[in-house]
Amino acid sequence: MAKPLSISSHPSVHLAWRAYFEMTKPKVVALMLLTVLVGMCLAMPTILPVKPLVAGLLGIAMMAGSAAALNHLIDRRIDGMMARTYNRPLPKGRVSARRALLFAALLGSLGFVILYVFTNPLTAWLTFASLIGYALIYTAYLKRATPQNIVIGGLAGAMPPLLGWTAVTNQFHGHALLLVIIIFLWTPPHFWALAIHRRAEYAKVDIPMLPVTHGVEFTKTCILLYTILLAIACLLPVLVGMSGPLYFVCSSLLSTGFIYKAWQLKYQDSEGLAMQVFRFSIYHLMLLFMALLLDHYLWA
């Protein structure tokens, strides 16, 4: 009597796809897509057209996932030596380097085609430039070359609102660049707070993060200064008439909270404060862009 087909291989297939999905850094991409969506919405005074909305979000997400996978590939050696990242798919051998490269290439290529065909070539090429900036210029070079790696490389990570804007308008606009400036200034205190918490691990793998090369106190001062600069930048949408009172109130509260956290980090000696600043920065960016979105539709 014939035996029924076995489905015992299904769990391994499921685990394999989970490994590939993990390489795309879905939580990071999700936050990035929020800023893309806000860029799209602020660019249009009316309801967004469906095709560039869907194609733009999908294509940008795929190319961002490709960049993240390349980051996993390039950093696989140091990831295996750090407590925060040792369990990633490549250090654990769940995905080979060859398959990771193929996955990143296919995902990025498909995302580029979607953007080029269904949105516009400008957005496709800008997203490709961001991919190169993050995966190759930052990850492969700047990260290992200078303690200003986050500052210089942060430009690539600040591009999503501009990508969203161009996806629906096919043109640059100064308002989109204001959103880029906000994320650009948000990036250093966000990552430096994490670097303070993980400074011993970065030193172990010879990554010249600012706390490793210039010390923790200097880094805390830089975090505080950047949060003040960020607070000023967050007011720019109001000053140019891009946003109204709702955003102004939300932005002011969020900036006050961020500066307070950075002040605590600088002047209070507590090991857990660095991670508090890191976590607060994530909520800060998410809520700030949600406030931009709500203000656009409720106050306009």
Swiss-Prot record:
This is Protoheme IX farnesyltransferase 1. It catalyses: heme b + (2E,6E)-farnesyl diphosphate + H2O = Fe(II)-heme o + diphosphate. Its EC number is 2.5.1.141. Keywords: Cell inner membrane, Cell membrane, Heme biosynthesis, Membrane, Transferase, Transmembrane, Transmembrane helix. Its main location: membrane. The chain crosses the membrane at residues 28-48, 54-74, 100-120, 122-142, 149-169, 176-196, 222-242, 243-263, 280-300. Pathway: Porphyrin-containing compound metabolism; heme O biosynthesis; heme O from protoheme: step 1/1. It is a multi-pass membrane protein. The gene is cyoE1. GO terms for cellular component: plasma membrane. Belongs to the UbiA prenyltransferase family. Protoheme IX farnesyltransferase subfamily. Carbon 2 of the heme B porphyrin ring is defined according to the Fischer nomenclature.
